[in-house]
Amino acid sequence: MGASLNEIKTKIASTKKTSQITGAMQMVSAAKLQKAESHAKAFQTYAEKVRKITTDLVSSDNEPAKNPMMIKREVKKTGYLVITSDRGLVGSYNSNILKSVISNIRKRHTNESEYTILALGGTGADFFKARNVKVSYVLRGLSDQPTFEEVRAIVTEAVEEYQAEEFDELYVCYNHHVNSLVSEARMEKMLPISFDEKGDEKASLVTFELEPDRETILNQLLPQYAESMIYGSIVDAKTAEHAAGMTAMRTATDNAHSVINDLTIQYNRARQASITQEITEIVAGASAL
């Protein structure tokens, strides 16, 4: 019985240490989430302004823009930029988006020649490699608050591959941050660029004289616009990652506390049984006298 008590005490001590670690990781993730949400909010304000200016420019002429970034072409090949984390301990964050991507590929494509994958995050890259799915570009090791410079390589690669007609449409696949408890898998079509023009927004630049001409400006602006929108998805995904990490660590901490409570009850019962046994033996010994 004594050995059993010591064993339970060891388990309790070990689980307490685990709960302290997961609790600390939860606090770290919460701090990262707060910072990421502020970053995402600031970028969203910027993105809305950029989109408004670009929409106004596209709508500044009665003739539709003829820029290749906006023209739909026959889809012979699709590009998927898949955003995952580099590490685990983030609950179902990675599995949700990867399941969504695989399901979509199986529905839309019959062979690998019809699509290409760019992987941002080690988990996604390793996932596709393990399944012998070709990945044309991989970027690992993003910081907790990624700057555009960190992701410039893969973002520029995606846009340039589209411009070179290596694929005919681009989807960015990521987890959208809803709140600290909820994220949703998204597959957003980024290329070709499409604008939902509202009546009150149209013609806001019609009276402006553009130097040089509109098409020349769009040739420079639209690739940068596409890159900024893709970067916005990366910022959003990173925010969702921190939220998933915080939730996973909170769940782990709660589970550890539950295990500690169960072990404590088990320990008390075992200790009570041990004491009862000792008393019984003492009484039996006294009776024998």
Curated annotation (Swiss-Prot):
What InterPro entries does UniProt report for this protein, alphabetically?
ATP_synth_F1_ATPase_gsu, ATP_synth_F1_gsu, ATP_synth_F1_gsu_CS
The cellular location(s) given in this protein's UniProt record come to:
Cell membrane
Alphabetically, which GO biological process terms does the record hold?
Answer: proton motive force-driven plasma membrane ATP synthesis
| PROSITE patterns in UniProt | ATPASE_GAMMA (PS00153)
Q: Transmembrane region positions?
A: none
CDD domains reported in the protein's UniProt record: F1-ATPase_gamma
One GO cellular component term of this record is:
plasma membrane
Q: Known Pfam families for this protein?
A: ATP-synt
Instruction: Write down the Gene3D superfamilies for this protein, in alphabetical order.
Output: 3.40.1380.10, ATP synthase, gamma subunit, helix hairpin domain
Broad class of the protein's primary localization: membrane
Give the UniProt keywords, A-Z.
ATP synthesis, Cell membrane, CF(1), Hydrogen ion transport, Ion transport, Membrane, Transport
Any GO molecular function: ATP binding
Q: Membrane topology type, per the record?
A: Peripheral membrane protein
Biological role stated in the UniProt entry:
Produces ATP from ADP in the presence of a proton gradient across the membrane. The gamma chain is believed to be important in regulating ATPase activity and the flow of protons through the CF(0) complex.
Recorded family membership = Belongs to the ATPase gamma chain family.
Summarize the subunit comment: F-type ATPases have 2 components, CF(1) - the catalytic core - and CF(0) - the membrane proton channel. CF(1) has five subunits: alpha(3), beta(3), gamma(1), delta(1), epsilon(1). CF(0) has three main subunits: a, b and c.
Q: What name is this protein filed under? A: ATP synthase gamma chain
Q: List the lineage, top down.
A: Bacteria, Bacillati, Bacillota, Bacilli, Lactobacillales
